Swiss-Prot record:
Functions in the N-end rule pathway of protein degradation where it conjugates Leu from its aminoacyl-tRNA to the N-termini of proteins containing an N-terminal aspartate or glutamate. The lineage of its organism: Bacteria, Pseudomonadati, Pseudomonadota, Betaproteobacteria, Burkholderiales. It comes from the Bacteria. This is Aspartate/glutamate leucyltransferase. It comes from Bordetella pertussis (strain Tohama I / ATCC BAA-589 / NCTC 13251). It is found in: Cytoplasm. Disulfide bonds: none annotated. Keywords: Acyltransferase, Cytoplasm, Transferase. InterPro entries: Acyl_CoA_acyltransferase (IPR016181), Asp_Glu_LeuTrfase (IPR017138), N-end_Aminoacyl_Trfase (IPR030700), N-end_Aminoacyl_Trfase_C (IPR007472), N-end_Aminoacyl_Trfase_N (IPR007471).
Amino acid sequence: MPDMSQLKELPFSTLQFYATAPYPCSYLPGRQARSQVAAPGHLINAGTYSQLVEQGFRRSGLFTYRPHCDNCHACVPVRVDAARFEPNRTQRRAWRSHQALRAFVAELAWSPEHYDLYTRYQQGRHPGGGMDEDSRTQYAQFLLTTRVNTRLVEFRAPQGQLAMISIIDVLDDGLSSVYTFYDPDMAGSLGTYSILWQIEQCRTLDLPWLYLGYWIADSRKMAYKANFRPLQMHVDGAWRETPP
């Protein structure tokens, strides 16, 4: 009889990949998108997922995918070289603005306080985008369902007010910034601060890369990622550093 425990360590080479049917693009209006999905999803563990991210994949809950669009290559996987990163003036200002915040690793579990912040963020920053109507179940499936090494980090003001939450995957060669949401009424570029904090965590953990997902030049929601340098892009199957 085969050792069933070996099934928990699915080699990357045995994964199967399939393309989804076309669906409306979330980032470029009027475009159709497709994704390449890694399967079987329930056997993708932390080590295998690290290899997938290195090949340009991301995850949404248990769904591990990368763009596979017809005649479009706008979505480019990007990662920051944590050791060599130097903040620009705007980023230094954001870092100073939120030094009073305290970060806590919390349980990756349902919390009414977290869901309330998520709802206010979506309604305040992305109204009409669809996610502003996410139910509790949709929220949990998106951010709380994982089979990899995931951390939920709370950022709180000195008085205890919840300002921001970052969901982060710990990989073999870095951190992957899954999603961040924050108080839309709080000034000072909290999203930028979150990325800077994650870069510092990479340095603390001696991990070389912070993976930021996909950069899309024509999407305002994604274009900001090019501001974090040195930045590498995954193009034609290889990581290449972008010009300064």
